[in-house]
């Protein structure tokens, strides 16, 4: 008979309540020789095999009918590699013992993970296919410092939490285990006995692949290979480059017409890439594609931050999808949500029985607007989980930029909270200092480790220095959405033209702060939902005027300083609000001479013109790149300005936001010569009235608007025209 561990310990191991399984299971040196213990429920017979010789060394005694086996080897003193020959009810199987392997995390990883500065935590935590001591399998690691016991459960062990309890690394609260023989594609979860003794089944926070709702398990999947960061893609994100973004929700851009089912990543790669290229957009921005349990969140309530959603295919399919865009010369932006997460039981909520990933105080940790939980940015491990995820998408999938959602909700503790419902910071202020530090760290890390990779903030307040570097007191973003400009200009466009003269400043106010941040001008998904109506439907007037207003507005927007963003469907003036559960109304484009086709052509030509003429983008963030020519003609609702590039080349832009044509309208210009009409939103090609300046016009030596020369123009009704000197 062997010398058994304490009976209470055996009972705890069998019941799945023993926190230190490696101290009992496996091979151990004792005063009487080697002792080997194993927990193999349902096994009928277990033999110990010397791996080197392949010979059976000894039979393990069944010390408990619930599956606890042990043997004492009095003649052997030194540990050796071994296996078990296990006889089940109908077969005999040679298996490796997970409890013969040593620790997995290296000291440097332990230090960096605890400090919260591990650049690639996803290389150590989660599930990783590997070979250990020449044995193929999977290493598992999960952070749950307050758990009483953590086990890996899955298809490979009948989802039985007794079979594979993990080792706790007390120095950092990480549980780890190497499971031989486990393969890619198998389902798994972590079974946690939390600090209160309650059993919880949790998906892997670092899983690279996950089941689609309503299922909730993680899937073992290889870590994606690194994607090369090319100079061309880096340059395309530069402040002096043209950036025109097509914002897309993959689940509703287009669907199968026969069953309204989603297109796959592969089908989207074939259709969406070609369309974006044809339309002249330089970038595509994807609403969140992280795995998420609720379709109606549009992806903005993710649980599987490291797993591309299975709705459209596999992680490799998504990676190929991104590569297809890159082959077409289009950069890919991913909407990223580090501000909150849903409270689904299988997710991060009370992960080990405590508020581990979220703030414990609901005044800090509960988001009232979305019924979600807020990450605890004060914890090193949480910051590392999020910052590592940002780098993961860039390094492993080739994502070129991240657009960070709801930044204001992160950096203000009183965001959407009444008096008494929020907790001040250490200094008594309303700023979330931990979130600010997290954003600065993440942005700085991306800037250093992924040159050319950029971040874009959806930040709706006037928080100063969003796009300033952290060492200058800023948050370190590269770009910021200009929500104020969007609201002001849309409010202006909604006015009846006869009343626009009273709101003239709405179109000019944006230039007063245009150089305080690196702005993107966004017409996003948020502007075509929740009863706001479509952008087209906001335009006043009859059908002709609605479409003319929209074309004129887009022309003004594309010429205004700031990079551009347009949500899908807006490029062809979809008439209804966006519905995430069905395709865009592509049938509106069936009429080649229709209104919607005209708007689509206009946006396409705007994009190609935008890329062709450097004055429209090169000096977006420098005062030298813009000059008002006509800023105060509120009576006629006319605006005129010029854009200039670094070489002094200029492009003139004039908008008439009334349905009244303006004849012989004089606009001062810096230089004499012939000015060619590059674009005219009133062209018949775009379904306008075809009024204009016969393709071009010569300047006159008549001073106007503080310039010695001027143009005598015909301004079509509800129009924007572009003019360039020469040609």
Swiss-Prot record:
It holds the Pfam family Alpha-amylase. Its EC number is 2.4.1.18. It is an enzyme of class 2 (transferase). Keywords: Carbohydrate metabolism, Glycogen biosynthesis, Glycogen metabolism, Glycosyltransferase, Transferase. The active site is at 405 (nucleophile), 458 (proton donor). GO terms for molecular function: 1,4-alpha-glucan branching enzyme activity; cation binding; hydrolase activity, hydrolyzing O-glycosyl compounds. Pathway: Glycan biosynthesis; glycogen biosynthesis. InterPro entries: A-amylase/branching_C, Branching_enzy, GlgB, GlgB_N, GlgB_N_E_set_prok, Glyco_hydro_13_cat_dom, Glyco_hydro_13_N, Glyco_hydro_b. GO terms for biological process: glycogen biosynthetic process. It catalyses: Transfers a segment of a (1->4)-alpha-D-glucan chain to a primary hydroxy group in a similar glucan chain. GO terms for cellular component: cytosol. Monomer. NCBIfam families: branching_enzym, PRK05402.1, PRK12313.1. Catalyzes the formation of the alpha-1,6-glucosidic linkages in glycogen by scission of a 1,4-alpha-linked oligosaccharide from growing alpha-1,4-glucan chains and the subsequent attachment of the oligosaccharide to the alpha-1,6 position. Belongs to the glycosyl hydrolase 13 family. GlgB subfamily. This is 1,4-alpha-glucan branching enzyme GlgB. It comes from Yersinia enterocolitica serotype O:8 / biotype 1B (strain NCTC 13174 / 8081). The gene is glgB.
